[in-house]
Amino acid sequence: MRKSKRERQELLQQTIRTTPFITDEELAEKFNVSIQTIRLDRLELSIPELRERIKSVAEKSLEDEVKSLPLDEVIGEIIDLELDEHAISILEIRREHVFSRNQIARGHHLFAQANSLAVALIDDELALTAKADIRFTRQVKQGERVVAKAKVVKLDKDKGRTVVEVNSYVAEEPVFSGEFVMYRSKQS
């Protein structure tokens, strides 16, 4: 038996609250209605689409994790983080990131993505870049997506130093690599 619109919308809200990563297709199947009906219900209830719900959940969990800088100061979007171990961020190269004459990304944006990821990775409220050895291996163009992967390769809390290796890729092709020596407070 089909539920009334009001009942369906109440159940839809409950379902999305308990399982925020459920797709519109799965919801349509669960409630035996069309995908368009689910989308209209979400719109009426001001429930964001799946991608926005995922982003919101990720931001909430990362806000509690990142200690060394506010999330809005990270260049790119952190999608994975394990403090003092590894992290991944994504940066969409848009018009504001490139030279207008050739649409090639300015190097400082790639450096900033890698450096801010290295800072965010540190499990300490104080994290500063002491030294960086970087290499740009190919040009990045407007419209490309840069995925930066950082991992801690050496951790010395007694000396207050952490070495972080960051490699950035566009479609699995290396575009940037760097080794960052990070200063951290000795009390963490």
UniProtKB/Swiss-Prot annotation:
SUPFAM superfamilies: Thioesterase/thiol ester dehydrase-isomerase (SSF54637), Winged helix' DNA-binding domain (SSF46785). GO terms for molecular function: DNA binding; DNA-binding transcription factor activity. Keywords: DNA-binding, Fatty acid biosynthesis, Fatty acid metabolism, Lipid biosynthesis, Lipid metabolism, Repressor, Transcription, Transcription regulation. It comes from the Bacteria. InterPro entries: HotDog_dom_sf, Thioestr_dom, Transcription_factor_FapR, WH-like_DNA-bd_sf, WH_DNA-bd_sf. Gene3D superfamilies: Hotdog Thioesterase, Winged helix-like DNA-binding domain superfamily/Winged helix DNA-binding domain. One of its GO terms (biological process) is fatty acid biosynthetic process. It holds the Pfam family 4HBT. Belongs to the FapR family. Transcriptional factor involved in regulation of membrane lipid biosynthesis by repressing genes involved in fatty acid and phospholipid metabolism. This is Transcription factor FapR. It comes from Bacillus licheniformis (strain ATCC 14580 / DSM 13 / JCM 2505 / CCUG 7422 / NBRC 12200 / NCIMB 9375 / NCTC 10341 / NRRL NRS-1264 / Gibson 46). The lineage of its organism: Bacteria, Bacillati, Bacillota, Bacilli, Bacillales. The gene is fapR.
